Amino acid sequence: LMIPKLLDAYKLILKLPQGHWKEVKLEEIKGLIADCAGLYLEAVADQQNAVKNGEVKVTIEAINRSNSDIELGSVNSMFISFPTSLKPYELKKNKKIIIESVAGTFNYQNYSSPYWLNKKGTIGMYHVDDKNNIGLPEKMMSFPIVFQLTINGTYLSYNRNLVYKFNDPVKGEVYQPFDVLPIATASIQEKVIIFSDNNAKQIPVTVRAGKDNLNGSVKLESPNGWLISPESQMFSITKNGDDATLIFSVTPPKNQSEGKLIPVLTVGNQSHQKELFTIDYDYIPLQQVLLNAEAKIVHISIEKKGENIGYIKGAGDAIPESLEQIGYRVTSINPSEITSKNLNQFDAIVVGIRAYNTVPELAFKQPELNSYVENGGTLLVQYNTSHRLVTNEFAPYQLTLSRDRVTDEFSEVTLLAPDHQVLNYPNRITRADFENWVQERGLYFPNKWGKEFTPILGMSDKGSKQTKGSLLVAPYGKGYYIYTGISFFREL
């Protein structure tokens, strides 16, 4: 009984002058009509991804759960060309209509990616072209399919987003967004590659296919003075989703230099320079993110002392990979391996970020670490939060963490102990090394420490008191204990 009255209201709203609220109320009342009719409309792609100007098969499903006279007149889209021979279908009560394997040509001109990442933003601000998307967790309908219906003689259209779905043995029916991706993407695993001498490095480039039987070439663009060999390489990938890895030799110039290393793919007469990241968690829709494919390459003169470094993993950082790039041998140390005998093989030991928050065994291993330092080792502990430490005895002397931090990555850094060897050996550290910081100076700096510690750096946010606990060094026995809350891990 409600549907005829709602249709009458819909017709009356249609007669109103054009305006924002007219459009809002038309959509709302169309939704009420669909709800009262128990109307189910769905468009499902047979694959999760497609490429520009490719083919995609769509299955249309429609159900009318009411006594209303409903006819599906047509289905169309701005991006998919459905066959013009699609005939009208009468939607009888509780009789499912399935139009299977409707082939179409994909005309979508953009790639799928979170709208706030499509263009480079500024510090603290994303660049969004379509202001209607701002604040939305996802872009509004990416691939709307328009269902043209006649309900009790009244013409209505409904938009449904094209989706991909499959049956999971555990989760059941799983829905995922349907995406348009490049025909090929590329990636360089190491995002920062450091050349500490003039020797060449072998750089692997991984090419991922976005379609079956993909053939093309890849080359590396680099700053002036860098040598790439070979100049380009061919690739051939049989199956969509598979990848191929090609190795390039990259030689730095003799002088110090830095810039971007960019893999450029050529397929047919088109070039592609994107890298694909997939974010897949149960609590959010699957996200396929396209970013510029690139790595930073740096040729810098670095003096290196020692050879073997031990690394105790915390919450995760790229410290080991970065140290390996400049020639160190880095060995991961499991908590059970923290013994005097095992530790003595290392010239230095680095403790990963938040290890004293996340590794319970460290509550019992600190005496072994202190003994290592006492016998001549160097122990560098990165930041931990002041809350829920597994032990408060994480240093050989008094050391108390606070919530002090410096969030402005451009804040001035003062060298409190410019002659200290930590700033001069084996490489000289100056204020210039703190320029072009990526994000914040550091956090959870100690605010109380024993007289044995020397504060090395001072820093503060504008209008705040200078903090001096960002980098503390103390001799202990024959070695050194270093604690730092500086966000080195964000710079790597």
Ranges and model annotations:
Residues 92-161, 250-260:
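Eukaryote-biased detector of low-complexity, proline/serine/threonine-rich segments
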Residues 403-492:
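Catalytic beta-strand/loop cores that center a nucleophilic Ser/Cys/Thr
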Residues 88-97, 235-244:
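Short proline/glycine- and polar residue-rich coil/turn motifs
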